[in-house]
From Swiss-Prot:
Residue numbers annotated as active site: S23 (o-(5'-phospho-dna)-serine intermediate)
UniProt name for this protein: Probable DNA-invertase y4cG
Family annotation (Gene3D superfamilies): Resolvase, N-terminal catalytic domain
UniProt entry tagged with the keyword DNA-binding: yes
Native organism taxonomy: Bacteria, Pseudomonadati, Pseudomonadota, Alphaproteobacteria, Hyphomicrobiales
Keywords associated with the record: DNA integration, DNA invertase, DNA recombination, DNA-binding, Plasmid
Listed SMART domains: Resolvase
Ranges where the Resolvase/invertase-type recombinase catalytic domain occurs: 15-148
Organism: Sinorhizobium fredii (strain NBRC 101917 / NGR234)
Top-level taxon: Bacteria
InterPro entries: Recombinase_CS, Resolv_N, Resolvase-like_N_sf, SSR_resolvase
One Gene Ontology term from the biological process aspect of the record: DNA integration
Membrane-spanning segments: none
GO molecular function, a single term: DNA binding
Amino acid sequence: MATAAYLNSPSLQQRLIGYARVSTEDQLNDAQVDELRAAGCHRIHQEHGSGASRARPVLAKLLKDLAMGDVLVVVRLDRLARSVSHLLDVIEDLEKRGVHFRSLRDPIDTSTPHGMFSLQVLGAVAQLERALIAERTKSGMQAAKARGRLAGNPGLRERRPEAIRAVSAARERAYLDELIVSAQTWLPTVRRLRPRHSWDNVVRILNRRGHDWTVERLRRAVHRLVREKLAEPELLARSLRRPPEDHLMRLVAGIAIADPNLSLRDIAAQLDQMQERPPRGGRKWQPSSVRALLDEASRIGLVRA
């Protein structure tokens, strides 16, 4: 009995967090909110905007703030994602962080076996959809070639300005969508390190954690999020120039700030893998060398003691 009471304690119950999106063309937000409340959502985040707009700052912040054990709840799948592949990307990222997803009007609940099966069916549908699109595109190109016509967009071939602008705008929208989905995996680290650390060091730390950034691509990504008011302008401030001997101290401090749970030995191992030479020679980094650099960083206020 004591075990049952423990398992049913409020601290272990899942937090149901709702997300409602309404466009100017579909003003049904109250109905969404009512359904989410009836489902037990104790917090509901509401997004307002044009149906044509891909920027969703409320959703971006919500995805970043969700914690392990939370359940993100929507009324319908189309309230969260614009396509099956986009939906699967979002859910996959949530699952990696221990966050579940539920759609009230669809058989999707990733905290249950049946819901996960439905999600796998959706994945198969998305794969089939991509294959059919590729097959139709290939057939269309072959038919056009047989009729002596060039495949592709006539407006682009003729360099019509309106066609070029439309394609450029579509690419920018797709780029922003990808950034918003992925930002929760890298933007918190950028926020902790910039602008006190150089872009070079930020990129090296992110890439050690499984990312694949270059300085140019990361700066462009942060610029875009700042422009959309999804990130703080201070992230783009110029880093102060530091003497060369300052480099190792700041790199070690950056690694420690990015992941406070790392031990001195863990940081030393990362520095070895990054092929950074120890400050006093030798072939491998020692925890004592890491400790000395962290003490120095603490003295100037770069990290907390």
